[in-house]
Amino acid sequence: MFLFSDGLQSINNNNRRKRIVKNAYIPSRGIRKIPHLSTLLPEFHIYKDGKGAEAVVGWGLRPTTHKARAFATEHQLPFIALEDGFLRSLGLGVSGYPPYSIVYDDIGIYYDTTRPSRLEQLILAADTMPSETLAQARQAMDFILQHHLSKYNHAPELSDDHPLRSPSKSETVLIIDQTFGDMAIQYGGADASTFELMFQTALNENPQADIWVKTHPDVLCGKKQGYLTQLVQQHRVHLLAEDINPISLLQNVDKVYCVTSQMGFEALLCGKPLTTFGLPWYAGWGVSDDRHPKIGSLIQTQRRAPRNLLQLFAAAYLQYSRYLNPNTGEAGSLFDVIDYLATVKRKNDKLRGELYCVGMSLWKRAVAKPFFNVPSCRLKFISSTQKLARVKLSDDARILAWGNGKEAIVRFAEQHHIPLLRMEDGFIRSVGLGSNLVPPLSLVTDDMSIYFNAETPSRLEYILQNQNFDDQDFQTALKLQKMLTENHISKYNVGSSDFTAPSTDKTVILVPGQVEDDASIRYGSPQIYRNLDLLRTVRERNPNAYIIYKPHPDVVSGNRIGHISPDDAARYADQTAEQADILTCLQYADEIHTMTSLTGFEALLRGKKVSCYGLPFYAGWGLTQDLLPIPRRSRRLELWQLVAGTLIYYPDYIHPKTHQAINAETAAQILIRQKNMQKNNNGLHRGCFAKKLGKIKQLYRSFK
């Protein structure tokens, strides 16, 4: 969590509770369909007709609001203008991505400088802004720059080999074009001649500089028109038409010229000198070089006054904007949205390109598909490598395989020099077994190997070895650990809490059984790879201990191999806990001895001593007793760092109903609720009908 997030959340909620609820007429069906609109507008009951209306709500200055504005005028009702917030979403609205923030204006709208707006009033009042608000603004600005966040967040970073990143580049000036029909131009005192003036001025004022013109990608492909496209055919002028993350672009130029684009304000956030030629909301306050002739009249009429960048940011992003918590759909804060967008932006960048999923069953396709539903991922399913060999692959194509990947898929990728991604269930997965066709809330996607393969470094190992964990990670990891341990959450959350506690003074050792043909044993436990051999070795090394053997739930349910007969188990174990859930067993154990079981990680979360006979992902970091060396893992970790890398940075999580991305804390909360609902059902032996019904539901959702 961010440092000020909880405080800001409380302030926002308190302010909303004070509002008197009124009836709002919203004629626009599109506005009414915005997810969680009632949360964003808590002061209103929302109606689609005007009967009994006490206010009217519309979208900015769009022509579609004429009806709503006319109704408000005729009935002498206040009109509320909404618009997308300045940190909106991962993908574009036209692509179906809903807003996580909106602005609410009961006076005008921020891009219309022909009259006052609520944002303008907030900025004018910013000289009395509390120090706490300014501190929050400073932290939020830093996070936005750190994570390269903007209104939309799907665009790739400026490539490493781009000329703008060259250390020997000349002085660079960025001119920001806009598209015809942009209302911020019309209501910002500008037209085509304004863009021509800006362009010529930039050339004249920077005779030695390279000039880069940023236009919209839709302009070059003919979908939209820009103002500067025809003017760039000049020496030292370059056209930037590709989609590029705005912050990464702005950080690599020296000076910026714009008319009314929001990128102008982002240039100020990046510390770049900015010259404006229109009347954007951030002009006239003394933070930019403003050339529009009406700036003076705004100052004379006291609609502008000296304000600093921090005050402008605080007014626009903290006070003027409203936010959802994207993980829960509840009222949120700027920091909730920053945190969420930073996470899903990393995921989008990780999955960018064309992904070919080869030879996967319909069930696993249905399970996997929602995890790859991000703007820049083009997921395609294909039945075999033979069919894939006939496909003309794009330059950004990769192959996606389940687990470590079938040998034929791995060999095909190597032979054709195609990068291979691997995926697997996450570590807090579901209430119910995967072999019982219960879909997961989390998956891991690994571009290096896969976490259970100790033969080669995985992305998780890289994260644990190299990630610069910060205080935010520390706080989130501790909170997550507390949630999981206090609510007894594990990977599958199955089994009964009925367990005969050992009555002994001996050291109690828990030995979790595993699925013997599991890839984690094949690639992570070269010396001991059978449950019976593990049990025998633990007894030989601990002759005086009280040993509890816990068979793997997939083995108990009859779905996988690894069974030990009762007689063999009794030869080395004092007790076998077949039906008990693993966390109940952990409560009574002093130590856990395992090959590669995830139980070892869950034991570390609960402060237990762990001995590893194989090389699981959590071994080798100084937190476990390891029988096998793994020199690659040279970093000594604290437990919270292991938690952060394993549960926060490595997996992806989705909501089981909405299929939208969520964070680890929200996933844990969902599992807690699901587990409480199924307390009377241990979940190990799921009936055939229940399996098929669940499978049909999942398949249906995936193809909706």
Swiss-Prot record:
Top-rank taxon, per record: Bacteria
Bilayer-crossing regions: none
Broad class of where this protein is predominantly found: membrane
Biological-process GO terms, alphabetical: polysaccharide biosynthetic process; polysaccharide transport
Protein's membrane topology: Peripheral membrane protein
Function as written in the Swiss-Prot or TrEMBL entry: Involved in the phospholipid modification of the capsular polysaccharide, a strong requirement for its translocation to the cell surface.
Protein name (record): Capsule polysaccharide modification protein LipA
Organism this protein belongs to: Neisseria meningitidis serogroup A / serotype 4A (strain DSM 15465 / Z2491)
